[in-house]
Regions:
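Short nucleic-acid-contacting surface segments enriched for D/E, G, S/T with interspersed K/R
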Residues: 82-98
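Short aromatic-glycine-enriched beta-strand elements
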Residues: 50-61
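Short, structured beta-strand/loop micro-motifs enriched in basic residues and often containing a Trp
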Residues: 74-82
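OB-fold/S1-family single-stranded nucleic acid-binding modules
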Residues: 103-127
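Bacterial N-terminal signal peptides that target proteins for export
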Residues: 1-12
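Short boundary/loop segments of OB/S1/cold-shock single-stranded nucleic-acid-binding domains
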Residues: 23-38
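Conserved hydrophobic positions within beta-strands
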Residues: 42-44
Length: 136
């Protein structure tokens, strides 16, 4: 009886541990608003290649002379590599246009859709708002 109880407890613990990563990961609709598309033009401050999502930080100048610092969620490093990105694709100071969906809480955070470069080139940043997974 004692060993049977231990097996049940151990099995339950393993199932709970396996479910933790799934529960910790958010969905697009939980955090971002598909009706709040934003177009941001600014300069790259930093690109973080981290899991489960990369983060692009940009400074966006406003008409009143102030600057907003936005944090843009992108795909994981492996997704970025598949889409043609590398760690040198967005050096600090690069001028870009970002099409993204803003956070539901109104924070200066968004899930990326596309990045447009001054030469007109567009690339998908692989954010959770992307469903096609294709290069743009």
């Amino acid at each position: 009886m004692h060993s049977r109880l231990l097996k049940v407890i151990a099995s339950a613990a393993m199932l709970m541990a396996a479910a933790l990563p799934v529960a910790a990961h958010h969905s697009f609709s939980a955090e971002f608003d598909a009706t709040k598309q934003v177009t941001l033009e600014g300069s790259v401050v930093q690109m973080e290649w981290v899991n489960p999502h990369s983060w692009l930080t940009i400074d966006v100048p406003k008409a009143d002379g102030t600057v907003e610092r936005w944090h843009i969620e992108g795909g994981s490093p492996s997704v970025l590599l598949r889409l043609g990105w590398n760690r040198n694709s967005l050096p600090t100071g690069t001028k870009i246009k970002v099409i993204a969906f803003q956070a539901k809480d109104g924070a200066l955070r968004a899930s990326s859709r596309d990045i447009e470069f001054p030469d007109g080139r567009k690339m998908n940043l692989g954010g959770s708002s992307n469903t096609d997974g294709e290069k743009k």
